[in-house]
């Protein structure tokens, strides 16, 4: 097996998926940034959730807002619902793993807040329940999905935003999700604090 050849194949596949995403995602990423900025300007916050790699993405996004992205600026209110192991395990034990995010949203979410819901398949049951809870709390939803959008896509309201990666391969979807998250962080900073150029 030629490992360097395989590495080149993987790089090329990632590049091609990003090129395909570039053709379709910019308006949705822009709209998502506007939704998030509007919430932040109106004293709202952004909650985020996902499983596995998507949980890591939720935490990555939250940390970029709470700390900083690529410039010095005030901290922005963002909470990853994936980080408190005591809360997650108590809900999973006493109720169901499908409720680990929705119960947190019912406690922490307020009208005007935004939920960043991340799932490569769009079919994660606990993320689907998180979207339902967010709507119950009069929150808007930004969904990062892939494939056909799954069950998440069918739950979204007209004012919500879906950023659906045009791929069926989990690794490629995750790579574009990370790029979309970095785009959102950049656009949020620019809209709130101006361009550094």
Swiss-Prot record:
Any Pfam family hit: SIS_2
Biological processes, Gene Ontology terms: D-glycero-D-manno-heptose 7-phosphate biosynthetic process; lipopolysaccharide core region biosynthetic process; positive regulation of DNA-templated DNA replication initiation
Protein name, per record: Phosphoheptose isomerase
Binding sites annotated in the UniProt record for Zn(2+): 60, 64, 174, 182
Any one GO cellular component localisation term in the record: DnaA-DiaA complex
Subcellular location: Cytoplasm
Pathway: Carbohydrate biosynthesis; D-glycero-D-manno-heptose 7-phosphate biosynthesis; D-glycero-alpha-D-manno-heptose 7-phosphate and D-glycero-beta-D-manno-heptose 7-phosphate from sedoheptulose 7-phosphate: step 1/1; Bacterial outer membrane biogenesis; LPS core biosynthesis
Miscellaneous note of the record: The reaction produces a racemic mixture of D-glycero-alpha-D-manno-heptose 7-phosphate and D-glycero-beta-D-manno-heptose 7-phosphate.
EC number: 5.3.1.28
Lineage per the UniProt record: Bacteria, Pseudomonadati, Pseudomonadota, Gammaproteobacteria, Pseudomonadales
Primary enzyme class: isomerase
Binding site for substrate: 51-53, 64, 93-94, 119-121, 124, 174
Reported function: Catalyzes the isomerization of sedoheptulose 7-phosphate in D-glycero-D-manno-heptose 7-phosphate.
Catalytic activities: 2 D-sedoheptulose 7-phosphate = D-glycero-alpha-D-manno-heptose 7-phosphate + D-glycero-beta-D-manno-heptose 7-phosphate
Cofactor binding summary note: Binds 1 zinc ion per subunit.
CDD domains: SIS_GmhA
Gene: gmhA
């Amino acid at each position: 097996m030629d490992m360097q050849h395989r590495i080149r194949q993987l790089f090329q596949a990632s590049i091609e998926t990003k090129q395909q995403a570039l053709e379709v995602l910019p308006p949705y990423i822009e709209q998502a940034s506007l939704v998030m900025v509007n919430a932040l300007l109106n004293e709202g916050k952004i909650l985020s959730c996902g499983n596995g790699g998507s949980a890591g993405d939720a935490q990555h996004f939250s940390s970029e807002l709470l700390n900083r992205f690529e410039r010095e600026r005030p901290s922005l209110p963002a909470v990853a619902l994936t980080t408190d192991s005591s809360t997650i395990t108590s809900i999973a034990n006493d109720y169901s793993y499908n409720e680990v995010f929705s119960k947190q949203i019912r406690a922490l979410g307020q009208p005007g807040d935004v939920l960043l819901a991340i799932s490569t398949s769009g079919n994660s049951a606990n993320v689907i329940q998180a979207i339902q809870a967010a709507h119950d709390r009069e929150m808007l939803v930004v969904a990062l999905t892939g494939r056909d959008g799954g069950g998440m896509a069918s739950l979204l309201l007209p004012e919500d935003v879906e950023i659906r990666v045009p791929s069926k391969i989990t690794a490629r979807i995750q790579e574009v999700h990370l790029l979309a998250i970095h785009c959102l962080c950049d656009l949020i900073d620019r809209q709130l604090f101006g361009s550094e150029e």
